[in-house]
């Protein structure tokens, strides 16, 4: 007999765990709603619908609160949720996405009925009629008017959000982003109109209100508003009188309390300006005073509410000015300043989470689109549109950007705006911050609210993270292509051309707006690059949009593009070059910054190109910093020692010096090195070159016969003076030296000195031979008797000379003396001898101090070059390097016999000793230190920017901006940099005068 097993009666209702509910009270809340009381298909569908809410726990809690509210009519709502799928989708979606709208529903429990049935979005006019009707009903009781309007506004937000979100829960239509943004703008218009009606009633009573137009700006003006956003407005009155201003002010107050923050900060003169102006007053302001950003803001202007005729007059008068704004003299400067300001607004710790202002974010798209509109809208009325999406379409249609790029950028923009909407809906707070990367719960909620589902490889949160990376990268890449790809297509070979492409005039306009002062030359350089034969031209076509975009942020994009062309032509045979720029964005970006800032480095890179490969990062940080200057110095000397021919030896030394200069200057320009490290590295390589040259010349001049055959007749030491002795060389510094010799056994002094002088002169001549590299000038004029004295002396001769005839300036010069090359033991003995002169046991004589002061006064009066500005000459100007160094040296002369720490050739270390000994108050020493560092940075930056030694800061303009960047100033605002330089050096000069006594 066959026994049949009874079928298992497995419950069909899913458990809270299967539904994704994690709140410990979830089961209790389900029971409270009675949703586990009936095991039927309707309840199964209901529960699975709840599980699809972005946050089912939040939705469940809101439903329980609603059920506990007497006026909600829970029996009716509960029954409707079982049978009405659209209502279920809308309500669960909005409660699982917005805690704030859940609170609103609990406060207004009958509002759930707005989500029932065939719900559609009202038109602009229908919304205005709703709000007007509410005002008419409420004006009998003005105290309740704004409360009722606030409720109506939140109800309309509830309906929109429910329709916007419903597709996350049920199979409902998806509202396009543009529809949502436009409806939010219509809702804002209706709310503003209602607030204006109430304001007129409050201020004017039964009197006729003044004529007032409210111009919507920003996202509201462009009809692309967020769920939560300030609404930017400008007020235009028939008269700018007290009553009109009171109405405008009252309208702002009412709307800000009831709906959203109303901001009139875009008005002429900003918050300092009059709240209301007439049309004529606006015209006068924009004709005379308005900045470029104010014309950019007018791109979005729209007459929203109030007096329509006034609004029309305002727009008719001002909009033509928008389309000629790019002809203004300061257009490029202001546009670049706006880009920088936007980037600096974002704190570093949240930059990766900023959906609006971060890299590859919304502002990148909006700014680029608006700039292209301003540049090309003058000659193309199809670009006279307000919304970003419409403008992208028009730019693609007009050939100003590729149509595929326009479509991709629009898709990325709408995706990022969708996330922005979802983030704001949660608490109805203005925010643009994505959740923390490790906040799994928040990321998962955002993914579900944005209707992102698992893809088989990742859960919803993982898919969102991948999509964000993809979209940010795409925006960043398209941001560059947006500006430059059409330019390249307009100059490229036939295979690259597109229909409706950009004309040469439009291309020149666009390049000028992007900061190129010579757009015609820039186009020629671009054409030469992309039209190279074979693979190189194709790779350049791919690379250039990104490279040019990065270069446009540099102070001198014209010079940078020329340098890039020269570099590319010089390295045409190096296969690694373009591959590195293509595959390593960090290298390419840093290279563009260097080329667009410096005239000094490009020539070095052409002859030492492998340094470019070090622009990337290694495991321990920037590879430019992996090189040890001391190791470079040893390698340089060793390399030169392999050659018997001095010319070849010095050529080998120059090669390594060139590479080291390129490395140090590149790291300096990229902000990787402190100025003191730069000076030490430059000193190290100079010392190595001196050692290599001296060794080579000694080898070449060894006697061929006689008792000294193959042996040097004398030992030679090179004493570094000035900045070389203090290890404070800059890019444009000469090497101040003295040569000292000591005869070999059996060689008389005169023969030894003759031989050593010949070697020293050959060292100077060989190093000073003109070449394509930065010069190697050796200056021996600080020796006793200056130019009139012998080039080389014996140690005994130096001792006798200093003991008997040392002049005050010679004593002062010895304060910086340091043995740098040649015979180390002889150099050490020279310094011991010099100590007796520069640090005498009883201090220097009062007469010597007076003479130093007199010479300083004469230097101040006579040494400054003709035409130089004494305030901005970094070496001899007020509070410049000479002032600080002479002050330190005077204090050394006065106190070194008492303060051993002053037996030092370094300016900064002596300043530390001066402060430690209390010779000058610490705060004043700090002023001297800051001035020395500031002037040294500026002087180095001048050489980096101009490519040749100079000490005079330029006046305001592009070159000063470049100097500011090269000197490490946080922006390329040359004026700010100059103000800081003047302030720092002025304060230091006061200390200098105090120490010198006059």
From Swiss-Prot:
Residue ranges for the region (Adenylyl transferase) are 492-998
GO terms for cellular component: cytosol
- Matching Gene3D superfamilies, A to Z? Beta Polymerase, domain 2, Nucleotidyltransferases domain 2
Identify the SUPFAM superfamilies for this entry: Nucleotidyltransferase, Nucleotidyltransferase substrate binding subunit/domain
Q: Which cofactor does it need?
A: Mg(2+)
Please give the InterPro entries that the UniProt record associates with this protein.
Answer: GlnE, GlnE_rpt_dom, NT_sf, PII_UdlTrfase/GS_AdlTrfase
* Zinc listed as a keyword: no
GO process terms (BP): regulation of glutamine family amino acid metabolic process
Which Pfam family, an example, fits this chain?
Answer: GlnD_UR_UTase
Which residue spans traverse the membrane? none
* E.C. no: 2.7.7.89, 2.7.7.42
Q: Where is this region: Adenylyl removase?
A: 1-487
Q: Which reaction does it catalyse?
A: [glutamine synthetase]-O(4)-(5'-adenylyl)-L-tyrosine + phosphate = [glutamine synthetase]-L-tyrosine + ADP; [glutamine synthetase]-L-tyrosine + ATP = [glutamine synthetase]-O(4)-(5'-adenylyl)-L-tyrosine + diphosphate
Q: Which UniProt keywords apply?
A: ATP-binding, Magnesium, Multifunctional enzyme, Nucleotide-binding, Nucleotidyltransferase, Transferase
EC supergroup of this enzyme: transferase
CDD domains named in the record: NT_GlnE_GlnD_like
Which molecular-function annotation in GO is an example for this chain?
A: magnesium ion binding
The family line of this record is: Belongs to the GlnE family.
* Function field: Involved in the regulation of glutamine synthetase GlnA, a key enzyme in the process to assimilate ammonia. When cellular nitrogen levels are high, the C-terminal adenylyl transferase (AT) inactivates GlnA by covalent transfer of an adenylyl group from ATP to specific tyrosine residue of GlnA, thus reducing its activity. Conversely, when nitrogen levels are low, the N-terminal adenylyl removase (AR) activates GlnA by removing the adenylyl group by phosphorolysis, increasing its activity.
Q: What is this protein called?
A: Bifunctional glutamine synthetase adenylyltransferase/adenylyl-removing enzyme
Instruction: Give the species.
Output: Mycolicibacterium paratuberculosis (strain ATCC BAA-968 / K-10)
